[in-house]
């Protein structure tokens, strides 16, 4: 404790107490903090806290560093345990002799058993592997995966897993994480990478949101515009036109109480007609995960209320 406080005080020194100069030299060889102007030795027990090795590029830095990966909630033991590589090579990259490979195989097997020692850990390990699979298939970034893993762990602590499938709860946690981090994914998209029905995922999500007191804001139609337009290979002009239509619709209260994906799909469909990049209702509906009837209904409301002159 005393050493940490002393280290902190040394690190906070910015000026020479003798002449006031900011030209301070850290002499790690002699363990001294010296003023470059007047030569005063400010501290004579200065310790280099960095590594003792040198690296000349990022590859060398990574290979020589001995610290492990950062802690992560997406692994059941938070990444704090040791793994034995499946490559039959030692730490120097040399091949393991054939006579030692059977022993190494047994070590790997026991290490795997020890890492997951009880039913609760097996459940968590299985769930987080499933989460990783879903997130990978949906191209969901790491920060969202971390959030989803934390939500799932909270659900386990609240005993919300009992009577529900692991896959369903994981899907609900992933959808909740997407909503919290403003990375829009529809229930249909989540359901497309699971064996759980969309209705069940939605129900699990609502239960989680209520009991875990998740702070989730309602999703907005404009959150989906960029991704839907990208899937439909529409230009930036069409995207901007769709966003303009949505802003006008919000100003007159057309979006309240309606599904954001349906409104976004209709705005994109209208924008594609206006800019001449025509897309069929079926194509837009498939990307947005809504029905053609929904697009037609929202299309009619938007064109009539906003007085848009659109030729189908």
From Swiss-Prot:
Keyword terms of this UniProt record: Metal-binding, Repeat, Transcription, Transcription regulation, Zinc, Zinc-finger
Lineage: superkingdom: Archaea
Residues of the signal peptide: none
Function: Stabilizes TBP binding to an archaeal box-A promoter. Also responsible for recruiting RNA polymerase II to the pre-initiation complex (DNA-TBP-TFIIB).
Keyword Metal-binding tagged: yes
Source organism of this protein record: Thermoplasma volcanium (strain ATCC 51530 / DSM 4299 / JCM 9571 / NBRC 15438 / GSS1)
PANTHER family: TRANSCRIPTION INITIATION FACTOR IIB (PTHR11618:SF13), TRANSCRIPTION INITIATION FACTOR IIB-RELATED (PTHR11618)
Matching HAMAP family: TF2B_arch
Record protein name field: Transcription initiation factor IIB 1
Sequence repeat intervals: 129-212, 223-304
Xref: InterPro entries: Cyclin-like_dom (IPR013763), Cyclin-like_sf (IPR036915), TFIIB (IPR000812), TFIIB_arc (IPR023484), TFIIB_CS (IPR023486), TFIIB_cyclin (IPR013150), Znf_TFIIB (IPR013137)
Gene Ontology biological-process entries: transcription preinitiation complex assembly
Binding site for Zn(2+): 16, 19, 35, 38
GO molecular function annotation: DNA-binding transcription factor activity; TBP-class protein binding; zinc ion binding
Chain intervals annotated as zinc finger (TFIIB-type): 12-43
Family: Belongs to the TFIIB family.
Keyword Repeat (UniProt): yes
One cellular component (GO) term of this entry: transcription preinitiation complex
PROSITE patterns: TFIIB, ZF_TFIIB
